[in-house]
Amino acid sequence: MKLTCMMIVAVLFLTAWTFVTADDSRNGLKNLFPKARHEMKNPDASKLNKRDGCSNAGGFCGIHPGLCCSEICLVWCT
């Protein structure tokens, strides 16, 4: 009986501790949606479309097509 009561108290304490230390996420999605809507209107604003560090035509790529902006690599970007 004592062990059961101690387990119940421990679970309640840990549950309360989780709620007290959690981040306030009430406005999390509210701030996310306007940014997503802006990226849908302007696809160039999306971070996924940006290719930082890619080589233009004539740049050395070895055999890794991911290094070229055109994704075509034959030792040199084409």
Swiss-Prot record:
One of its GO terms (cellular component) is host cell presynaptic membrane. InterPro entries: Conotoxin, Conotoxin_d-typ_CS. Disulfide bonds join C54-C69, C61-C73, C68-C77. One of its GO terms (molecular function) is sodium channel inhibitor activity. Residues 23-53 form a propeptide. Expressed by the venom duct. It is found in: Secreted. Keywords: Disulfide bond, Ion channel impairing toxin, Knottin, Neurotoxin, Presynaptic neurotoxin, Secreted, Signal, Toxin, Voltage-gated sodium channel impairing toxin. The keyword Secreted applies. Residues 1-22 form the signal peptide. The presence of a 'disulfide through disulfide knot' structurally defines this protein as a knottin. The cysteine framework is VI/VII (C-C-CC-C-C). Delta-conotoxins bind to site 6 of voltage-gated sodium channels (Nav) and inhibit the inactivation process. Belongs to the conotoxin O1 superfamily. This is Delta-conotoxin-like S6.8. It comes from Conus striatus.
